[in-house]
Amino acid sequence: VNVDDLLRDTLREQAAEQPPAGPGFADWVLAVRRRRRTRQLVAAVVATVAVVAVAVGVPQLYSGRSDVRPSGVVDRGNTSAHPGQSPPRELIAAGRTALAAYYIPTKVTVSARESVSERTYWLFDRKTGTYVKAPKWSVVTVAPGMKTAAVLERTLPASRIGLLDLATGEVKRWIQVSHKVGGLSFSDDGRKLVATTYTHNPDAEFHPADPNVGEPDVPSSRTGFYVLDVASGKGSWAGVTIGGQRADGLTTLVNYRQDFALTRDGRYIWAGLPSDEVDKLFYDFTGAEVPAPEDGSKYLVWFVDAGLSPDGEHVAGDFAGQTWTTSSYVIDSATGEKSEVRGQQLLAWADDRSLIAWDIGKGDSGAGKSEFHARLVLVTIGSDKEVPLSGFLGGSTDVSAGRWQPVFATR
């Protein structure tokens, strides 16, 4: 595939994209950060993206026509981009990382005082090379290698965890739990699974009887976490308090959904906090608080999904917007020194120096522009180039038609 072909394919696909969404992005970001500072937030303003960047800075970029793989194979290292597809129909991948699944959120009214953001997932099917709807599951996380996923059934919190064979679409084993689960996360090696426990649906939103008084102050129902061995299904549960005044005088808050995850080395558990004084805490497997590991974990930003780079030398940071209109910080894990990389929200590392990110299209900044008009791109430390990987999102809120959220895994 030569540059002319790539450019022609990209222009053709982009011509079929959805029209820009309406304004209101800045207000939405402020509201989301104030309410829950969720991982789905899409940060501020514009990306200057040249179409010719499609052919720059990646090992090999496939057009939609040539991205067909044999059954059971997901090539490591190759870049698979579909700039005209949103949501994607065919595999999106770069370097070590692939879009293993995505979900579309829908707001469902439970009562006059409560609504729930429900997810409908599409999982990558190796046999067809496409994403296939999987309506049974309310939560899906995919293990490294993209052969197994951990799933929860529709009603949250759930009393059992399924281990789904992604080749067959069948659950290989159910893990029964006595504390109901609302969130799941694999360790980096795929051998452990952290399950966050809740007493109420963590995706619920509560509304005041009087809309003029603001949102009611409803505490999180999070109770703790399981650390489970994936091979045996065995593990232990630890209770963790949900926040408030600490013995050291600092105050912590917990979002209604605030899931736990394992640290890079798999020795500890951590979770973020939407607090100015304490933004994350680390625990041993008994739930006792411990210091941050000496691997750069102290620089982790809990709502930035990319985390530590594969070689451990960098940590993906929050929105920057200094060198470019839309950019994010990358932090040296040894020194804490910050530099910038293109992209408004860093989602996953493709290799030691490249990341998959959300970023806005060219011309989408300024008054009256559509700051929600974001797509997946590949960015690289030290480069001002971006490679479009997906088409643009539609809609103007996190539950609008045309919005979808990615689920990445190491392939």
Regions found by a protein language model. Name each.
Residues 1-77:
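N-terminal export/targeting signals for secretion/compartment entry
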Residues 52-150:
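Non-cleavable N-terminal signal-anchor transmembrane helices
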Residues 75-83, 110-136, 158-177, 223-244, ...:
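Surface-exposed loop/turn elements that mediate protein-protein interactions on large endomembrane-trafficking
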Residues 89-96, 139-149, 184-193, 259-268, ...:
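Blade-terminus and WD-like Trp-Asp/Gly-His loop motifs, strongest in beta-propeller folds
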Residues 93-114, 196-220, 361-370:
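Short, conserved, GDST-rich strand-edge loop motifs in beta-rich repeat architectures
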Residues 102-105, 153, 197, 272-273, ...:
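Recurrent small/Gly-Pro-centered beta-turn motifs in extracellular repeat architectures
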Residues 137-212, 216-227, 232:
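Non-cytosolic head/periplasmic domains of membrane-anchored proteins
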Residues 189-323:
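Acidic, serine/threonine- and glycine-rich low-complexity intrinsically disordered segments
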